[in-house]
């Protein structure tokens, strides 16, 4: 990062950290489980208020995504390999899970779902053209797919232009979020899922990448996690009896504060808890796409089944890569 933006202190990154950081993988696991617990609250399976902030796992995913992909383009900027890896990594599980959810909704829950809606999922457009069709977890994956097209272009920019772009994304998202919370709930709920609300997560992910590339550390892990806990408490104390104040507090104030903290944690992640937590991070994509369906079918137990199905479907696709990474942990 240019020195006139932040004061920094140098870090020494190990070879393993530059190539693969298990602490980052662990963060992905935490994010997926956070969203899984959040859906226990939205489905009213286990409506505990402590699960309400769980949706914040989504922007953590988005920040990590652009942060990691920009790093990988530093190592190998070959576009064929970049897109081939994204397709191999995302498409098989995405199409399998989208089709499975469609069939369960149609034949088990007897919901009114159409082939057209399934087609929109297949071409990554359902989140915009048919929001809330038959599974609303796929909207984030569709946003990611479109973002994958822009990340190589962002990577080619100078650090200064990356930073200016990041600031633009953050400000536009903040203005958008502040505006939509003033609308009636039905309109807000729809616009909340649209891409503009989430662009700030990518903005902070870009800034995290610039800072990391320049070996800059801002806060200690303990300080960042302490601040994260305070934000969590702030979320739980948001006034639920006033819809406007609640959405303003949670979707604007807390959301934008937590994005900064996520950036700090990405730059200096907490230590690895165990191989299990890292492994959950490695199959976090599978956990994310399967957990909601399993919760709808089995309730609380659905979280465990979601992890099991993620293991059965994602692990075989990346078996060698995952096992190699786990061996690195010793």
From Swiss-Prot:
Q: What GO terms in the biological process aspect are recorded for it? A: polysaccharide biosynthetic process
Under Gene Ontology molecular function, one entry of this record is: acyltransferase activity, transferring groups other than amino-acyl groups
Q: What is this protein called?
A: Putative acetyltransferase ORF330
Q: Name one GO cellular component term.
A: membrane
Query: What EC number(s) does its UniProt record assign?
Result: 2.3.-.-
Where are the bilayer-spanning segments? Answer: 29-49, 50-70, 90-110, 118-138, 163-183, 190-210, 225-245, 252-272, 273-293, 297-317
Q: Which UniProt keywords apply?
A: Acyltransferase, Host membrane, Membrane, Transferase, Transmembrane, Transmembrane helix
Among InterPro entries, the record links this protein to:
Acyl_transf_3_dom, Acyltransferase_3
Q: Which Pfam families does the record associate with it?
A: Acyl_transf_3
Report the record's disulfide bonds. Answer: none
Task: Tell me the membrane topology, using the record's own terms.
Answer: Multi-pass membrane protein
At the top level, the lineage of the source is Viruses
What species is this protein from? Acidianus two-tailed virus (ATV)
State where it is primarily located.
host cell
> Which EC class does it fall in?
transferase
Q: Where in the cell is it found?
A: Host membrane
């Amino acid at each position: 990062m240019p020195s006139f933006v932040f004061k920094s202190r140098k870090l020494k990154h190990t070879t393993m950290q530059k190539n693969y950081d298990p602490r980052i993988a662990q963060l992905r696991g935490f994010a997926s489980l956070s969203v899984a617990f959040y859906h226990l609250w939205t489905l009213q399976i286990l409506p505990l208020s402590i699960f309400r902030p769980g949706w914040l796992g989504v922007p953590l995913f988005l920040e990590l995504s652009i942060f990691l992909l920009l790093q990988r383009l530093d190592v190998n900027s070959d576009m064929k390999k970049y897109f081939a890896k994204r397709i191999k990594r995302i498409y098989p599980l995405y199409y399998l899970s989208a089709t499975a959810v469609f069939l369960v909704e149609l034949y088990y829950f007897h919901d009114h779902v159409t082939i057209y809606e399934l087609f929109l999922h297949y071409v990554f457009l359902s989140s915009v053209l048919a929001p809330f069709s038959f599974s609303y977890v796929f909207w984030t994956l569709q946003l990611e797919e479109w973002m994958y097209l822009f990340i190589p272009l962002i990577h080619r920019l100078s650090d200064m232009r990356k930073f200016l772009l990041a600031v633009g994304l953050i400000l536009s998202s903040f203005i958008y979020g502040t505006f939509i919370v003033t609308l009636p709930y039905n309109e807000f709920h729809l616009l909340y899922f649209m891409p503009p609300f989430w662009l700030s997560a990518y903005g902070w992910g870009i800034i995290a990448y610039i800072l990391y590339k320049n070996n800059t550390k801002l806060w200690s892990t303990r300080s960042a996690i302490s601040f994260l806990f305070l934000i969590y408490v702030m979320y739980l104390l948001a006034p639920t009896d006033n819809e406007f104040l609640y959405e303003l507090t949670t979707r604007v104030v807390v959301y934008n504060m937590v994005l900064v903290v996520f950036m700090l944690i990405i730059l200096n992640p907490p230590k690895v808890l165990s191989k299990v937590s890292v492994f959950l991070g490695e199959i976090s994509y599978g956990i994310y796409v399967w957990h909601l369906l399993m919760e709808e079918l089995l309730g609380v137990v659905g979280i465990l089944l979601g992890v099991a199905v993620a293991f059965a479907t994602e692990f075989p696709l990346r078996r060698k890569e995952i096992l190699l990474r786990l061996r690195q942990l010793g």
